[in-house]
């Protein structure tokens, strides 16, 4: 015996457009979907500040970070927590044009090291960045986030249009942890880090 429900179904309520949940037009992707979440580690930039050092030391920190990046890419894996510390010390090439000048005698070794580790495209991009690369100091990031907090921002979309290695994004306060953060970076080495 089959019994039919002849009751009419309640119509769905009409919801104004501004109250409707919108589906994002931007699709997220996972660069390494095969790596389990348990093997992923978020690096805490706020508690791992990078101190100022001279040009040669900045070069060697950058070089070490590129080496870690290349290892991770070649092995199709994320950086370990120890490797993340090395990556966090990458500051780009702004202010170190000597490393790209084959005539700078004191920088001959570093010049050769860069030519050896970077692809021609990466090298050209890094060389171009010597005049334009700038990494936002933590104090500036913190001040901007404080203003956003005072304005009541807790969740929504945040765009970092020139994110470098993610220093600004890495300073995101707990109060905004539900925000969707989008980062764009032209330099492939910085973006990879």
Name each model feature, range by range:
Residues 9, 18-193:
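Class I S-adenosyl-L-methionine-dependent methyltransferase catalytic core
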């Amino acid at each position: 015996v089959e019994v039919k429900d002849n009751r009419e179904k309640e119509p769905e309520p009409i919801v104004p457009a501004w109250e409707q949940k919108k589906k994002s037009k931007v699709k997220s992707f996972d660069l390494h979907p095969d790596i389990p979440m348990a093997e992923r580690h978020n690096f805490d930039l706020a508690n791992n500040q990078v101190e100022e050092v001279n040009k040669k030391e900045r070069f060697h920190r950058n070089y070490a970070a590129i080496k870690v990046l290349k290892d991770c890419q070649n092995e199709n894996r994320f950086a370990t927590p120890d490797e993340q510390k090395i990556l966090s010390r990458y500051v780009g090439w702004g202010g170190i044009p000597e490393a790209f000048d084959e005539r700078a005698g004191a920088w001959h070794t570093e010049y050769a090291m860069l030519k050896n580790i970077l692809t021609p495209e990466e090298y050209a991009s890094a060389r171009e960045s010597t005049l334009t690369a700038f990494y936002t100091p933590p104090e500036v990031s913190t001040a901007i986030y404080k203003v956003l907090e005072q304005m009541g921002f807790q969740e929504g979309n945040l765009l970092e249009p020139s994110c470098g290695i993610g220093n600004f994004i890495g300073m995101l306060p707990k109060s905004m942890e539900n925000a969707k953060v989008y980062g764009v970076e032209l330099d492939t080495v910085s973006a990879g880090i």
